Amino acid sequence: MSSDSHRFDAKSVLVTGASSGLGAAAVRRFAAGGAMVYAAARDQERLAEVAASCAELPGDVRFGHLDVADPASCREAVAAAVGEFGHLDVLVNNAGRHDFRLTPDVTEAQWAQDIAVNLSGVFFCAQAAIPHLLEAPGGGGNIVNVASVAGVVGEAYSAAYTAAKHGVVGLTKALAVEYLRSPLRVNCICPGGMDTPQVHTIDVPDGADFELIMRVSAARGFMSADQVAAAIVFLASDDAGAIHGSIQVVDHGHLAG
């Protein structure tokens, strides 16, 4: 991790989907930079473990419940983060879900759930956070949305996920234009294949081509969650002050050729 332990002193950060994988890595990165972090997810036991893992870091990590599929829960999580720290500087929209299914097998409920978690939750968290981010101390907060390489290309057996992640990219651009004349910054990370707990439990549907699913691993293999978290933290930092409306692909060069 970065040796700059004061990069986010006095800054408050809300990270969604923070109980494992990329979200947990982002919490640790921000805490290492001195941030006040509100880690939000459904699994409170895992969140407690993430917070405990940050105990020796200079930041302050609190945690609470969030179900991004529920707009009211999104509003409550933002209010809780502001209540804990008095203000909000950064929102990291990381929560998501991904199941592989052949398109003819996707039910209406599965489609609705994927869109609710992967796209609507991003919108409702941003909607609740923006009024606070516009009043962030020091002049403007920022949002980092986590999409996927499936937000810029197609991904097999992932119709709902791909549609939602393309939506996150579009939402990022829409918000960036809407707040072009304000101090608020909005950017998006599109990670490729990461070595997270989820990747070790991939359920390949019957009739699927496993090689198509594993294309995201690229020639250099899976990235660590911490590598991608470093990109999130950079975009949220003052060092990225000129970056607004950007779609940052982080994929070991997979989409380069």
Which residues are covered by each model-predicted region?
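Alpha-helical segment proximal to the catalytic Tyr-Lys
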Residues: 131, 177-181, 241
